[in-house]
A protein has these predicted regions:
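Intrinsic-disorder-associated interaction segments
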Residues: 15, 65, 110-114, 212
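Generic detector of solvent-exposed, compositionally biased contiguous segments
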Residues: 45-82
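Short, solvent-exposed loop/turn segments at secondary-structure junctions
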Residues: 95-98, 156, 224
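Helix-hairpin-helix/helix-loop-helix acidic hairpins
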Residues: 68-145
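C-terminal accessory module of base-excision DNA glycosylases/AP lyases that mediates lesion recognition
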Residues: 1-58, 148, 158-230
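Alpha-helical context
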Residues: 66-67, 129, 147, 151, ...
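Short, hydrophobic/aromatic alpha-helical segments in well-folded domains
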Residues: 136, 150-153, 204
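Active-site beta-strand/loop microenvironment that shapes enzyme catalytic pockets
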Residues: 142-158
Length: 230
């Protein structure tokens, strides 16, 4: 680790827990060529998606057998698609072949004023207003959409270089193991909406970004990799 990186860690003091681990993970990842996440295989479950959401059958058939983060980001940025289609692409990536996913998403799609909620949250995310976008969906709920999958939607809505990071159960578990001191006084769980928790998470990743030079989405991915390997 460079002298400047060590100086940043010293400045953070007790908040360095977790940040130093991310710094070490980033060095390994970058030296390995920054490999991308393995695409999510969705072909096996596509019939269930079509069964539970038949009105989007044509869209489901347009999806490739595997989807990665770049594919979903490009899809969510495609203004020729409806907001519902863009949202579905995110949920398919998030749930993959999990059996209950299509049913839950069918309930989300039936939510009142869905198009308005998706378009407003998309716009806030494109502006890089992470906490505003999070709070909007917290205050204007989409049925069955909790904060974990809401942040997946916001992540793909956000435009590089500003990335709105995912905060799901995998991230929350890693935080509890490696960075809980930074989250003192706020709930760590991703199951419940908490602007304080998400704000603390954004602050944590901002500090890690200053140290590593990586974007928030890249740091979240490293957290995901580290959590999955343990």
């Amino acid at each position: 680790m460079s002298h400047s990186s060590k100086a940043i860690l010293l400045r953070y003091g007790e908040d360095m827990e977790g940040i130093e681990r991310l710094a070490n993970l980033s060095e390994v990842w970058v030296s390995a060529g920054s490999p991308l996440q393995t695409p999510a295989e969705i072909a096996k479950g596509i019939k269930t998606w079509i069964r539970d959401i038949p009105e989007f059958k044509k869209f489901f058939f347009s999806l490739p057998p595997e989807v990665d983060r770049k594919y979903v980001r490009d899809t969510v940025s495609n203004c020729r698609l409806t907001f519902a289609e863009r949202f579905i692409a995110t949920m398919v990536w998030g749930y993959g072949n999990v059996g209950y996913g299509p049913y839950r998403v069918s309930k989300m799609l039936a939510s009142e004023n869905l198009d308005t909620k998706l378009s407003i949250s998309w716009g806030l995310a494109r502006e890089g207003a992470a906490l505003d976008a999070y709070n909007y969906l917290k205050d204007n709920r989409i049925e069955q959409l909790g904060p974990a999958f809401a942040t997946k939607w916001l992540y793909f809505c956000s435009d590089e270089p500003v990335e709105i990071p995912i905060y799901d159960s995998v991230v929350a578990r890693w935080i509890g193991e490696h960075a809980k001191e930074h989250f003192a006084g706020v709930p760590i769980s991703s199951e419940y909406w908490s602007a304080n928790t998400y704000s603390r998470y954004l602050n944590f990743l901002s500090k890690a970004s200053q140290l590593t030079g990586l974007k928030a989405g890249e740091l979240e991915y490293l957290i995901f990799l580290d959590a999955q390997s343990n």
